[in-house]
Amino acid sequence: LVQEKELISKIVWRLMPFLGVLYLIAYIDRQNVSYAKLEMVGALGMSEYAYGLGASLFFIGYFLFEVPSNLFLNRFGASRWFARIMITWGIVTVALAYTQNATMFYILRFLLGVAEAGFFPGVLYLLTLWFPKDYRGRMVGLFMIFSALANAVGAPIGGMLLDLNGLLGHAGWQWVFLATGIPAVLAGIVTFFYLDDTPEKAKFLTEDEKRWLHDRLARENSGMEEHADNGFKALVNPRVLLMALCYIGFPLAAYGLSYWLPTIVRGFGVSNTTNGFINIIPWVIVALALWVVPAAADRAESKTPYIVGPAFVGAICLALSALVTSPTLQFTFLCVAAAGIFAGQPVFWSLPSRFLRGAGAAAGIAAINSVGNLGGFVAQNVVPWIRDSTGNDILPMVFLAICLAVAGVLVIIVGRMLAARQAISV
């Protein structure tokens, strides 16, 4: 007789720490540009706006190749495709260490987006193959905790790497890229041998456990309109398009804050290393919120309050951070805002798998994420533009607050539309 909790626990311990470490590497790799910026701008003779444009080209490559990447993952399997993703993005990151000019920086940032496209939605899709729907919110939350840890760990690492300036003839910003690109390549090799594509192929599960999980997921998937062989149908599903529209504000606020936070803290007059350690604080708070909120949402019938509530708290705190003059109060509000921005996202991601499955889920989740992540492109252009136009490091937070508040309102509207169609419980 299969014990549900024991089986889920076995899968959690096999998959989640490993996927989390991959995301840790991915997120540190993605955020390294915010630390390299502190020296790279001067070294390449770029303005804040020009650097923001280059950094944001990542999201264009990411947007264009996200859906194809997830469909390839569905076809070739997680172990091979995730290995490809990590190895190629590691190689491009190492190449960024040897950027000679702005044009080269622009090209490599675009290629980095192409290389990494499909990783995050790929994991979200993979979780639908392994976990019943009642567990997915918590699993996405657990997975995203590693993004908070990446920001916490990446902050002091980024600061310390900058302080290696001159070591072995390399500038500090070059060390930032080298130290984050090489681990990605190594992790990709390990992924190929460690990761199981589906429960049916998993050697760590018994035949009874495989059968129980298969039957449970089959019951949950019965009646869904997006069939396993029709991924492209999901791309024109109105619910997918509406959810993509809702999601834009969340990455916009997240990238805007995490990209600019080191610059804000540097304005307090601290060293690079101290800057890094101070930036640990908000991400510890985010990690706690990512566990508490999704766990509560999984036990609740209505999911919308667990998405919208944190978003509104985040928007209010972002706005307040721009209104106060005390650095301590500014930083406090930004810490709470960070938690609000991230806490509801795992709950949001538990919704698409309630009406999508198979290749439809792979394509639909990727479409929502790719369109939503255009918010990152907007943030990394508008935030430095506001800074350059006003000369104020903190004023861009007002823009982020407005975008996050609008996202919260859209979630309420779309949630009601989805509920009216009786597709999912929201």
Describe the predicted segments one by one:
Residues 108-145:
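Cytoplasmic helix-loop-helix junction between adjacent transmembrane helices
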Residues 65-77, 289-302, 387:
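Helix-to-loop junctions at the C-terminal end of transmembrane segments
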Residues 64-103:
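Conserved MFS/SLC helix-loop-helix module at the cytosolic interface between two early adjacent transmembrane helices
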Residues 33-34, 233-290, 345, 349, ...:
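Extracytoplasmic gate region of multi-pass secondary transporters
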Residues 45, 77, 98-104, 115, ...:
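Helix-breaking motifs and short loop linkers at transmembrane-helix boundaries and internal kinks
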Residues 303-351:
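C-terminal transmembrane helical hairpin of 12-TM major facilitator-type secondary transporters
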Residues 137-162, 183-184, 369-379:
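Glycine-rich segments within core transmembrane alpha-helices of 12-TM secondary carriers
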Residues 14-48, 64, 154-158, 257-262, ...:
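Extracytoplasmic
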